[in-house]
Amino acid sequence: AEAEAVKFHELSPVRAVPFCQHYGVCGGCKWQVLPYSEQIKYKQKQVEDNLKRIGKIELPEISPILGSAKTEFYRNKLEYTFSNKRWLTNDEVRQDVKYDQMNAVGFHIPGAFDKVLAIEKCWLQDDISNRIRNAVRDYAYEHDYSFINLRSQEGMLRNMIIRTSSTGEL
């Protein structure tokens, strides 16, 4: 079952506005509606609950999570998937437009191994990753490379891993 919030009667005073255009569809940044300081509190509680209540593990007091100085562009590796079955967002479906380009380079939709959300900008890895991914995508379009059909396993392009270092090397 799926649901979509259509109206909020009152927003939490700690709610944040998600900065990613793909928020709510991608699944990569599920916590963006909370400020980072609040995310850490809830993640701490989740870890403790998983260990104590679910795992039945008696623990001494757990030290607080040490937050990162970076809340954007902090990952050093991302794996993108190519697919010939691009996921259409609810907004795209509502527009009732026929899309000529159904290929995508991006991330799997949560719960759908064969559907990939086309990512234009990802805030998880340094911006050079976005430029590389989009350049490879454009090159593949221009040269008519086939994107994989994840069900039949036919197609040339399947995955792309981009790894960066703190020095900016690729």
For each feature predicted by the language model, list its residue ranges.
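Accessory RNA-recognition modules of RNA-modification enzymes
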Residues: A1-L170
